[in-house]
């Protein structure tokens, strides 16, 4: 299991309990979500990434309890979205649902709720800094923040976000590249969700086709190639699958070296065929 070099140790890759495992209705525990997280833990994932907005923190909590993995061995991330006007309450609710005394990483899920509710980003970040001081979270960061959003936050912050989590794959590289470079210049780790989007959502497109053409060259899967591409850019990949064999593939993505020419070609093809799946404001 790789560990990111900068800041608090962040296990790589992360298992994302996000839109693919979204809980659509409140009520009984969704065993499909529970079992997916348990399978991820059994396969070897120790970094679990979830969020308030997905409605499945309780399922993650059940999975953590049933898997019986020592809490000290895990790295748990969650995010606040709807309740940015009361972050302490949102944090306590996430902790309750997850059945844990602390989060390893807590993120502001998006800057958009601050604009919609006319709450200064600085106010939300101050609450995150306060949460860090309580010990209920061990590090704090943001998600889906653009360069202007980060600049606004950094004007008044006393603590730099440890992480900015964004959609990251070749087909958003045009918009993501300057943002990644900005974050890295400030010592902010970039995590990337949706790293397999070209394979899942544009399977006949040029990025997917080129990725698949590399399988025989490197003797690895297309999944591993795109995860490796993200990591080669200094981005921690966050991926999701319900298939145990695919989970093992993901955990073994760093077993080979991508040639620079192939890294560059994936980026070039992505820039030429831009396709964003989530958080459209990131292109604004």
UniProtKB/Swiss-Prot annotation:
Its EC number is 1.1.1.190, 1.1.1.191. It holds the Pfam family Aldo_ket_red. NADPH binds at residues 49, 143, 165, 196, 201, 239-243, 246. The active site is at residues 54, 109. It is an enzyme of class 1 (oxidoreductase). Changing residue 202 to S: 2-fold increase of activity with NADH; no activity with NADPH. It catalyses: indole-3-ethanol + NAD(+) = indole-3-acetaldehyde + NADH + H(+); indole-3-ethanol + NADP(+) = indole-3-acetaldehyde + NADPH + H(+). It is found in: Cytoplasm; Nucleus. Keywords: Cytoplasm, NAD, NADP, Nucleus, Oxidoreductase. The keyword rRNA-binding does not apply. InterPro entries: AKR, AKR3C2/3, NADP_OxRdtase_dom, NADP_OxRdtase_dom_sf. The record marks 79 as: Lowers pKa of active site Tyr. GO terms for cellular component: cytosol; nucleus. Monomer. Belongs to the aldo/keto reductase family. This is NAD/NADP-dependent indole-3-acetaldehyde reductase. The lineage of its organism: Eukaryota, Fungi, Dikarya, Ascomycota, Taphrinomycotina.
């Amino acid at each position: 299991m790789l560990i990111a070099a900068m800041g608090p140790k962040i296990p790589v890759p992360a298992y994302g309990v996000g839109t693919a495992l979204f809980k659509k209705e409140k009520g009984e525990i969704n065993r499909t979500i529970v079992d997916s997280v348990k399978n991820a833990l059994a396969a070897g994932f120790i970094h679990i990434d979830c969020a308030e907005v997905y409605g499945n923190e309780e399922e993650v909590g059940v999975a953590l309890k049933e898997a019986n993995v020592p809490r000290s061995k895990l790295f748990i991330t969650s995010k606040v979205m709807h309740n940015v006007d009361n972050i302490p309450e949102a944090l306590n609710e996430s902790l309750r649902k997850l059945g844990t005394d602390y989060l390893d990483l807590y993120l502001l899920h998006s800057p958009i709720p601050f604009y919609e509710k006319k709450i200064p980003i600085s106010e939300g970040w101050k609450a995150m800094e306060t949460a860090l001081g309580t010990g209920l979270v061990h590090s704090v960061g943001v998600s889906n923040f653009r360069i202007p959003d980060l600049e606004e936050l950094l004007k008044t912050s006393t603590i730099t976000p440890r992480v900015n989590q964004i959609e990251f794959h070749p087909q958003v590289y045009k918009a993501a590249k300057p943002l990644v470079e900005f974050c890295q210049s400030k010592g902010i780790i970039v995590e990337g969700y949706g790293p397999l989007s070209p394979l899942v959502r544009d399977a006949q497109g040029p990025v997917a086709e080129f990725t698949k053409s590399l399988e025989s060259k490197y003797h690895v899967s297309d999944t591993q190639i795109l995860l490796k591409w993200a990591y080669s850019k200094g981005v921690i990949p966050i991926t999701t699958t319900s298939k145990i064999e695919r989970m093992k593939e993901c955990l073994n993505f760093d077993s080979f070296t991508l040639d620079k020419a192939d890294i560059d070609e994936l980026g070039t093809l992505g820039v030429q065929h831009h396709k964003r799946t989530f958080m459209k404001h990131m292109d604004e």
